[in-house]
Swiss-Prot record:
Protein name, per record: Phosphoglycerate kinase
UniProt: ATP binding residues: 208, 296, 327, 354-357
GO function term, MF aspect, one: phosphoglycerate kinase activity
UniProt pathway annotation: Carbohydrate degradation; glycolysis; pyruvate from D-glyceraldehyde 3-phosphate: step 2/5
Family, per entry: Belongs to the phosphoglycerate kinase family.
PANTHER family noted in UniProt: PHOSPHOGLYCERATE KINASE (PTHR11406), PHOSPHOGLYCERATE KINASE 1, CHLOROPLASTIC-RELATED (PTHR11406:SF23)
EC number(s) reported in the record: 2.7.2.3
Origin species: Streptococcus agalactiae serotype V (strain ATCC BAA-611 / 2603 V/R)
UniProt cross-references to PROSITE patterns, sorted A to Z: PGLYCERATE_KINASE (PS00111)
Lineage: Bacteria, Bacillati, Bacillota, Bacilli, Lactobacillales
Catalyzed reactions per annotation: (2R)-3-phosphoglycerate + ATP = (2R)-3-phospho-glyceroyl phosphate + ADP
Top-level class of the enzyme under EC nomenclature: transferase
Keywords: ATP-binding, Cytoplasm, Glycolysis, Kinase, Nucleotide-binding, Transferase
Pfam families the record matches: PGK (PF00162)
Amino acid sequence: MAKLTVKDVDLKGKKVLVRVDFNVPLKDGVITNDNRITAALPTIKYIIEQGGRAILFSHLGRVKEEADKEGKSLAPVAADLAAKLGQDVVFPGVTRGAKLEEAINALEDGQVLLVENTRFEDVDGKKESKNDEELGKYWASLGDGIFVNDAFGTAHRAHASNVGISANVEKAVAGFLLENEIAYIQEAVETPERPFVAILGGSKVSDKIGVIENLLEKADKVLIGGGMTYTFYKAQGIEIGNSLVEEDKLDVAKDLLEKSNGKLILPVDSKEANAFAGYTEVRDTEGEAVSEGFLGLDIGPKSIAKFDEALTGAKTVVWNGPMGVFENPDFQAGTIGVMDAIVKQPGVKSIIGGGDSAAAAINLGRADKFSWISTGGGASMELLEGKVLPGLAALTEK
């Protein structure tokens, strides 16, 4: 990566601004999944071990109006982070003003401060999300000219707390998490060890058109599963019953199939049910066609075997999107089968592109078997699509 990293700058005695991704799920004020906090620890620990004063910025959820602030404070995150670091985390509970400035100026070397949810600034004119120039300058002024971006999950957004701060500091550098994310995903797509197999699931073709097009050029095989299977089926005149379909994307699906030169591999059967919820019958289809009055909710056993075969000998695998409605035990066999087929390949570099796939690997007990699980769904999708990420582009060149 041709950008400066946190190891390229002197941090001792400096107020170091750090964009992290602490957008964690909360239920009744309790964090239900702390992976993103854990993922940021190496960078935070490095800064404080080097004698820097870490000033952390993160968003949490969407905030459009005053009422949306309810339950979106980063206070529970500050407490969790303090426990993980084994030291106090200063939390003034504001995004600007004298209280914040005084707390920052009182910091000593090796201390950590967490600014309140950056999206609280969206209540008055979307200042964070629209990269308000004044806000970016203000936040940049709170530090000593060094900004560390370690939030891969928001790297595809141009916000005040990443791109805005970057534009107003002497040095904007990558943290360890951002550096690793870019290295794993970009290298897998641009310079993969072959055979390189991509697996794309999820419900909508529309979400993955750019990704499929880019990966058809780069990968040796592209396996398709999940709900978008049925748009590809219908584009070929295959009966899909009541399965999910994007009627306005049938031509796109047809076009992708025609120009794929046989690289695009579709399921050959499905697990179908007579309703999405409250179903009374679940069965495997004979072939591709889904029965009238039924809908496909997972790939079937023949497809699992076909995908297993397609993955044999793979040296690089990128997976984004589950094969079915994995949250329901009746429709998780496809996702489990594909995961197991990936991780059993000897010497494979296996990467999960965040989002639902990451949740599936964690929930189904396979997370530790993968080489890398991305912390950013949208950002990893844009990298897989070959796009430039604004948060990365804004960093200082080496």
